[in-house]
Regions:
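Residues lining hydrophobic/aromatic ligand-binding pockets adjacent to catalytic sites
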Residues: 1-177
Length: 177
């Protein structure tokens, strides 16, 4: 498949969420939450969600290596990703240079090339979520990415302005001059 979707569950009713996936032809979910559970929205707990999606013919896979909320990554020069002023995004961009991230991305790339896949997290708005950086990584590998916002609204992803795709297909986000 040439297109990968991203979607945030946002605590929506599960039927609405499944409808979003079906409307976009999604057959597989890649859950990129570091902790795949929710006290406020138990319908999005890993096992419950897996069961619900299976009932609609949608596969589920948790990819913890792509989860957000990362700490500092040693040995990454601070200027490599200085474009990101938000500490969470900066740390995640640093983390994207690790073997652990590369391993998770390889799983996602394999899945996405086999079946229509959506990268899922909790945050509804892609620009406030680490899915935006995962979208950049997918773009670096030549895939198209579409952010699903609602039944009537989706947006094609574009590489973050200022992002640099390096020869090994990793990314850097240097500060703008």
């Amino acid at each position: 498949m040439d297109t990968v979707y991203t979607v945030g569950h946002g605590g929506r009713p599960i039927g609405e969420f499944v409808g979003l996936l079906q409307e976009n032809g999604v057959r597989s979910i890649a859950d990129v939450r570091k902790l795949p559970g929710s006290n406020r929205h138990p319908q999005y707990n890993r096992d419950t969600l897996r069961q619900t999606l299976a009932g609609h013919g949608i596969a589920y896979r948790h990819i913890p290596e792509l989860g957000g909320l990362r700490g500092s990554t040693p040995d990454i020069p601070p200027q490599r990703n200085a474009l990101w002023r938000n500490r969470s995004f900066h740390r995640y961009a640093d983390y994207m240079s690790t073997a652990q991230f590369a391993s998770g991305l390889a799983v996602l790339l394999h899945t996405a090339r086999q079946t229509p896949t959506a990268v899922m997290c909790a945050e509804t708005l892609w620009w406030r979520c680490h899915r935006r950086l995962i979208a950049d990584a997918l773009t670096a590998y030549g895939l198209s990415v579409v952010h699903i916002l609602s039944l009537r609204r989706s947006e094609p992803a574009a590489l973050t302005p200022g992002a640099v795709i390096l020869p090994d297909r990793t990314l850097a986000y240097p500060a703008r001059a």
